[in-house]
């Protein structure tokens, strides 16, 4: 096809610049899908879009290029320095692609209708792809955080709840589970919102105990369920597949069932007698020597764990623990967290 030359060279420059912008943005997303998501189908789709645009990137546009005389070339924006997470980079590049395609679509409609049509088609399809890729990327990021987590703090009602959690995060705790069973909903939401914001600033996971609705309302990273709470499938319908779900288990049978139900991690216990669940029988240390044979999910030992017994449980292969009173009941939550983490990392 021959392109009808546009008498206005500025339009040719504009199309050239936006073709470059769209193709570069597509390459950023493509490489993320290739190296991080390892999704061959997405890579093929994105590569095909790049090539479609490349075939229509005629010399008439490249010859009109004037980067050296463009006074706006190379302009930066303060927001660029704030893109520290992959999701932020992806979102910025999706927006870049969509905006560039819209400009191409508008200015090539008369002189290059084929390019205009291609740009419109890609733009509409990439809106849906953006949602899918960001959801998958978010879940992958949460899973990686989960796997690297050593210590989870489960909260309880406390007069200095926010301060205690903040001290734990400063000490290096990377997962907080908000658990306040007797707290009214309006107070739970207020506290959960503040905790979610704090955890985000420390790049730590934040989950809500039992309440998938509140987890969704405050944009928590997920929800932790007990055996008598709503089914995992129901929780998935509420919070979606881009969030993580944990499940409490108390026997080998429950551990095996959890693996097939679609949760992301499990809590196993109580390993010792605990103040929070005084009527539950403890599993004992020997029970945990069998766990790795039964599940590939990340799992946390829970129940009565403290600085005095944590060395014993490490001897049977326990790598992750969840605690309540060992930190929430400590005189110095910061030092208590540091001591537990130090023992876990030995």
Swiss-Prot record:
InterPro entries xref list: Aldolase_TIM, ThiamineP_synth_sf, ThiamineP_synth_TenI, ThiD2, TMP_synthase, TMP_synthase_cyanobac_bac
Keyword annotations: Magnesium, Metal-binding, Thiamine biosynthesis, Transferase
Cofactor binding, per record: Binds 1 Mg(2+) ion per subunit.
One Pfam family matching this protein: ThiD2
Stretches the record annotates as Unknown: 1-125
Source organism, top-level taxon: Bacteria
GO cellular component, one term: cytoplasm
Binding site for 4-amino-2-methyl-5-(diphosphooxymethyl)pyrimidine: 177-181, 209, 248, 277
Pathway(s) per entry: Cofactor biosynthesis; thiamine diphosphate biosynthesis; thiamine phosphate from 4-amino-2-methyl-5-diphosphomethylpyrimidine and 4-methyl-5-(2-phosphoethyl)-thiazole: step 1/1
TM annotation in the entry: none
Keyword Metal-binding: yes
Catalytic reactions on record: 2-[(2R,5Z)-2-carboxy-4-methylthiazol-5(2H)-ylidene]ethyl phosphate + 4-amino-2-methyl-5-(diphosphooxymethyl)pyrimidine + 2 H(+) = thiamine phosphate + CO2 + diphosphate; 2-(2-carboxy-4-methylthiazol-5-yl)ethyl phosphate + 4-amino-2-methyl-5-(diphosphooxymethyl)pyrimidine + 2 H(+) = thiamine phosphate + CO2 + diphosphate; 4-methyl-5-(2-phosphooxyethyl)-thiazole + 4-amino-2-methyl-5-(diphosphooxymethyl)pyrimidine + H(+) = thiamine phosphate + diphosphate
EC number(s) stated in the UniProt entry for this protein: 2.5.1.3
Positions annotated to bind Mg(2+): 210, 229
UniProt-recorded Gene Ontology molecular function terms: magnesium ion binding; thiamine-phosphate diphosphorylase activity
Signal sequence coordinates: none
Residues where 2-[(2R,5Z)-2-carboxy-4-methylthiazol-5(2H)-ylidene]ethyl phosphate binds: 274-276, 304
Protein name (database record): Thiamine-phosphate synthase
Organism: Prochlorococcus marinus (strain SARG / CCMP1375 / SS120)
């Amino acid at each position: 096809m021959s392109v009808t030359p546009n008498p206005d060279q500025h339009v040719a420059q504009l199309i050239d610049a936006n073709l470059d912008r769209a193709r570069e943005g597509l390459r950023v997303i493509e490489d993320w899908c290739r190296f991080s998501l390892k999704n061959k189908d997405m890579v093929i789709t994105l590569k095909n879009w790049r090539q479609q645009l490349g075939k229509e990137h005629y010399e008439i546009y490249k010859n009109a290029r004037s980067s050296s005389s463009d006074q706006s070339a190379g302009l930066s924006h303060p927001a660029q320095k704030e893109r520290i997470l992959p999701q932020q980079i992806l979102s910025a590049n999706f927006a870049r692609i969509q905006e560039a395609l819209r400009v191409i679509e508008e200015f090539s409609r008369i002189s290059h209708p084929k390019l205009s049509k291609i740009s419109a088609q890609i733009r509409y399809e990439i809106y849906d792809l953006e949602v899918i890729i960001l959801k998958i990327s978010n879940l992958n990021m949460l899973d990686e955080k989960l796997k690297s987590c050593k210590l989870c703090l489960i909260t309880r009602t406390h007069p200095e709840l926010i301060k205690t959690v903040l001290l734990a995060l400063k000490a290096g705790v990377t997962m907080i589970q908000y658990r306040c069973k007797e707290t009214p909903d309006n107070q739970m939401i207020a506290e959960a919102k503040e905790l979610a914001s704090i955890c985000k600033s420390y790049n730590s996971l934040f989950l809500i105990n039992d309440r998938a609705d509140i987890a969704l309302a405050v944009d928590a990273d997920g929800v932790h369920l007990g055996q008598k709470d709503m089914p995992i499938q129901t929780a998935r319908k509420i919070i979606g597949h881009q969030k993580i779900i944990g499940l409490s288990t108390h026997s080998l049978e429950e551990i095996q069932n959890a693996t097939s139900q679609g949760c992301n991690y499990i809590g196993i216990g109580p390993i010792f007698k605990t103040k929070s669940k005084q009527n539950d029988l403890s599993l004992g240390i020997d029970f945990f020597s069998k766990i790795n044979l039964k599940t590939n999910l990340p799992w946390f030992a829970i129940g009565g764990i403290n600085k005095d017994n944590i060395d014993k449980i490490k001897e049977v292969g326990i790598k992750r623990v969840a605690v309540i009173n060992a930190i929430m009941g400590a005189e110095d939550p910061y030092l208590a967290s540091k001591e537990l983490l130090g023992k876990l990392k030995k």
